[in-house]
C-alpha cells in the first residue's frame, strides 16, 4: 500500500492543512525576520530518498554501512560552507540553530561556567543566556544590553561585565538588533579576559555570505548560524570556525554529545543552499534585502514610529509602540487580519510580558525573495502604518487586505501555483 500512497488520498485532513498553508504563504505578505522562502531545488533535496538513510558519525567514519553516497552529500555541504564563509572548519549536522549553539556550550564549557551574552529584551536570543533556556539554567549567565539613548550595543558595559565576572565565553549575535556589530571590539574584550568569543550570526548569515555585512568568522573562535532566514535554505543549523584545532571538540559535541544520526536530507538541502549562495545573483538579492529594509524604515520613522537604534543596516528592524500606547500583540493581530504577517517582540526595558510586548519585529528577506523593490517596500511600510494608526479599523483592514492580495498575485512565491 505505502508504495503508491499519496497524502491527498490517504490523509485528507493533513493534505487540506498543507494546501491551506500554501495558500496562506501565497496570499499573505511575510515580514517575520526569521522566515524566508527556499528554492524548489532546496525542497527537492529535503524531500528526497536521503531521508531514509541513517549515518551516525562523519564522512569516512560512520557507524553504519551503505554510507558511500551520503558521505559525498555531506562532504559537498562541508566544502561549500567553508568556501562560502572562509572557514577552516564546518559542521553541517546540527538539526537547528539552537542545537548548534548547545553543541558549542558543550564543547567549550563545563556546567556552571560563566557566559556573557546579550539579554533577550535587548535583542539577544534564548540560547544566549536566557534564564528559561539551557544556556541560563546550566551556566552562570550574565547579560549585557543597549545604550538607552541610542539603542546601540553598550560595548562599555560588555567590557565592564567581562572584567567583573571573567566569563569563560562571550556571546555576540542577536535576533532583533538592526545595526552593524563591532566584531573586533568583542574580540578585544574577550582577549582581555581570556574568554572564547562565540558569535551567533543566524540572522545575518546570508548578508555575510554575500559580503554586505561584516563577517565574524575572522574574529570569533566559533560561529554558528541557522541555514534558513537570510541564507534562504532549509530549517537547520551550521557550526563554523577559523580554528581547526577546535574541530575534534566541536564534532564530538555535536555527535555523540548532542545528537544521534544526522538528517541527511536536510544536509543535502544545505548543500544546495550553499551552492545558491555562492552565485553572483545571491549578492544582488542580499543587497536588495538591505535596500528594502532601509526603504521601509524611512517611511515608518517619517510616520512617527520609533525604530530601536534609530534605523537599520541589515534586514530587520524593531519597532517600539510604547509612545502609541499600543501592544505588540494588538499590532500583530491587526496586521495579520490585513494579510501582513509580523511578530510581536519585546523592546528594551519592556513593561509588558513576553506574551504581550510593546513592539513588533519586521524583516525583508521573504518579501525580497518574492520580488519586492524599494518602492514597493516603502508602500508596504505605509500600509503597516495605516493599519496601526487606525488601531485595527475594519475599513482600513479591508482596504489594506485588497492591496496585499493584489501585490501577492503580481509577485507569486512559486510559479507552480499559478
From Swiss-Prot:
The alphabetized UniProt keywords are: Amino-acid biosynthesis, Cytoplasm, One-carbon metabolism, Pyridoxal phosphate, Transferase
Gene Ontology CC annotation, any one: cytosol
**From its record, what is one biological process in GO terms?**
glycine biosynthetic process from serine
UniProt catalytic activity: (6R)-5,10-methylene-5,6,7,8-tetrahydrofolate + glycine + H2O = (6S)-5,6,7,8-tetrahydrofolate + L-serine
Q: Which GO terms describe its molecular function?
A: glycine hydroxymethyltransferase activity; pyridoxal phosphate binding
Q: What is its main location?
A: cytoplasm
Pathway of this protein? One-carbon metabolism; tetrahydrofolate interconversion; Amino-acid biosynthesis; glycine biosynthesis; glycine from L-serine: step 1/1
Family matches, as Pfam families: SHMT (PF00464)
List residues binding (6S)-5,6,7,8-tetrahydrofolate: 120, 124-126, 353-355
What cofactors does the UniProt entry give for this protein? pyridoxal 5'-phosphate
Q: Which InterPro entries match?
A: PyrdxlP-dep_Trfase, PyrdxlP-dep_Trfase_major, PyrdxlP-dep_Trfase_small, Ser_HO-MeTrfase, Ser_HO-MeTrfase-like, Ser_HO-MeTrfase_PLP_BS, SHMT-like_dom
Q: What is its EC number?
A: 2.1.2.1
Report the residues modified as N6-(pyridoxal phosphate)lysine: 229
Give the EC class as a word.
Answer: transferase
Record flagged with keyword Repeat: no
Cell location: Cytoplasm
Q: Where is this site: Plays an important role in substrate specificity?
A: 228
On subunit structure and binding partners, the annotation says:
Homodimer.
Q: What does this protein do?
A: Catalyzes the reversible interconversion of serine and glycine with tetrahydrofolate (THF) serving as the one-carbon carrier. This reaction serves as the major source of one-carbon groups required for the biosynthesis of purines, thymidylate, methionine, and other important biomolecules. Also exhibits THF-independent aldolase activity toward beta-hydroxyamino acids, producing glycine and aldehydes, via a retro-aldol mechanism.
- Give the family, as the similarity comment puts it: Belongs to the SHMT family.
Q: What is this protein called?
A: Serine hydroxymethyltransferase
Q: Which organism is it from?
A: Psychrobacter sp. (strain PRwf-1)
